Amino acid sequence: MKPLLSVVIAGVCAATLHTGAVQADEVKVAVAANFKGTIERIGKEFTAKTGHTLAISSAATGVLYTQISHGAPFDLFLSADAATPEKLEKEGKGSDRFTYAIGQLGLWKKGGPAPDEATLRRWKGNLAIANARTAPYGAAAMATLTHLKIDPKQYRLLTGANIGQTWQFVDTGNAELGFVAWANLVEAGKTAEAWAVPADFYPPIEQQGLVLKKGAAVEALVAWLKGPGQAQIKAAGYALPQ
């Protein structure tokens, strides 16, 4: 009987693995520009563990809102704020809203020395900033200037469509100074060239997710972001939700 039992168990295991492979699916993720690199890294481990793959589309939060409102076929929205997912949820576009990270703002001067508040106050040159109307990190940057009672007109502002483009402005030398996502600085190993803007200078950048289309693969990814993925999110330069 033992050989027969072994064959039966082996057959059940093989069937389970085969079923898992068939059920593996692709999750279409709309992600805010600041979180693109992080979700790509998380996605590799998630795929290795679950078999589910990610199809990632990245843009400014406001741009993604417009796309989702017009029926873009995404399964999950990872926003750079809380207001946009909340608005979409009220409009009946999604459900199961959750906070996955708290964003942090940085002021970057490529090549250093690291800037600080005094640098920002005396600066008269180019300053890169994301569009405050569509990019939450841009809104946080403008809130920082308001908090410090600095008139933005003292700078030559270069406005990026999203925080990724703002990074490019500084990285290419088009702007000597720029507000960027701290996570992007961590990813590039550039934190020594930047100032971590104090969190009380701007409203919390509470980054929320919204399920747009329910399914097993989407549920698995959400669970991963709330669980094993939190370590990677913290390592990427974000604060974690309480």
Specify the residue positions occupied by each region the protein language model found.
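Bacterial N-terminal signal peptides that target proteins for export
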Residues: 1-9, 19-20
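C-terminal segment of classical bacterial N-terminal signal peptides
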Residues: 14-22
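Exported/periplasmic ABC-transporter solute-binding proteins
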Residues: 25-49, 55-58, 62, 66-70, ...
